[in-house]
Amino acid sequence: MDQIQKVAFQRVFKTPGVKNQVADIAKKASWTPLLSAADGTKVTCSPNLNAPETTPGEERTFGDGNEVVGGIPISLGSSPTEFAAVIRRQPQSVIAQLKKMMCEEVGVYIFDINGMIGCLADNPSNPTKYEPIPIFSMFVGDYSFGGYDGTGSNNISWKFKPNWSDNLVFVKPQDFNPLTDLVNPDSDSSSEI
């Protein structure tokens, strides 16, 4: 997957205990009802994401020297993966809508520069259902003035749990480009929420 350009947010659970899943994620017809939904299945597309950076979690360890056998640290797993980007030149009403998701249990479908969709699958080698990648500690920052040589912007960031990518798959859409064809209802463009 290449540069992330947009994401689609969706609640992880459509109802308590029942995960959101899409059977045929490669067809636009699967997305259309999700964009206009008024329940827990609703999908909301982000504006364009600039300067996206993903920092994979580093190993967490315990001990050294005489504290552990042979002085070899004990591996405890990994820390979360961090994602950060910048949203430029968007009305603050769009940003306010994104901020409402900061206290929701949401996930993301990732759209790259080539229109590929990144998401989780029930079985990565033979997927039958796809779901959003859960995110945590979502943050949407206040407006930053751009100055003479820049543009106004808002920072956005979140974390993925350790091992988040174990069931990650990349899907090529069959009849649409998610960057241009998935538009939030009542929007003049795909960059508005």
Predicted regions and their residues:
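Short acidic, glycine/tyrosine-flanked loop/strand segments centered on an H-E-D-like triad
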Residues: E82-R89, G115-D142
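Solvent-exposed edge beta-strands and adjacent loop segments
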Residues: M1-A84, I133-G150
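Short linear motifs in intrinsically disordered/low-complexity regions
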Residues: Q3, I25, G40, L49-A51, ...
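Mixed-charge, glycine-accented linear interaction segment located at domain edges/termini
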Residues: K129-I193
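Oligomerization/assembly interface segments of phage tail-like spikes and tubes
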Residues: V69-I95, D149-D166
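Short, hydrophobic/proline-enriched secondary-structure or compact coil segments at domain edges
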Residues: V7-Q10, F83-I87, E104-G115
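Short, acidic/charged, Gly/Pro-enriched secondary-structure junctions
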Residues: I95-K129
